């Protein structure tokens, strides 16, 4: 089991709001055996918690750190980074 992390810039207009958080949580839920944590300004939330992610208050231009622990952590982290880098598929 390995643990990897990456710093990611929030690029979508509304930041980590309800819909974006739900997409993130849905992606995490599909990751068998992964433990995902998201951190902003020393505050952390479980990657599987919509409310926890929203409480981080990550807005456009903010930087968050995603940490993934699991047997396929690098691939799973890349998938989450891509989701954020593409603005959660929003305009």
Outline where the language-model segments fall.
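Intrinsic-disorder/low-complexity, polar/charged segments enriched in Ser/Thr/Lys/Arg/Asp/Glu/Gln
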Residues: 3-7, 63-65
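Alpha-helical protein-protein interaction elements
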Residues: 8-9, 16, 75, 80
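C-terminal structural segments of small proteins and small subunits
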Residues: 55-91
């Amino acid at each position: 089991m390995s643990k990897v992390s990456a710093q990611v810039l929030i690029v979508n207009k509304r930041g980590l709001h309800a819909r974006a958080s739900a997409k993130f949580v849905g992606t995490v839920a599909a990751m068998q055996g992964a433990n995902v944590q998201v951190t902003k300004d020393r505050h952390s939330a479980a990657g599987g918690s919509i409310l926890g992610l929203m409480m981080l208050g990550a807005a456009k231009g903010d930087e968050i750190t995603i940490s993934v622990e699991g047997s396929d952590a690098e691939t799973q982290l890349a998938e989450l980074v891509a989701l954020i880098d593409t603005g959660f598929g929003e305009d």
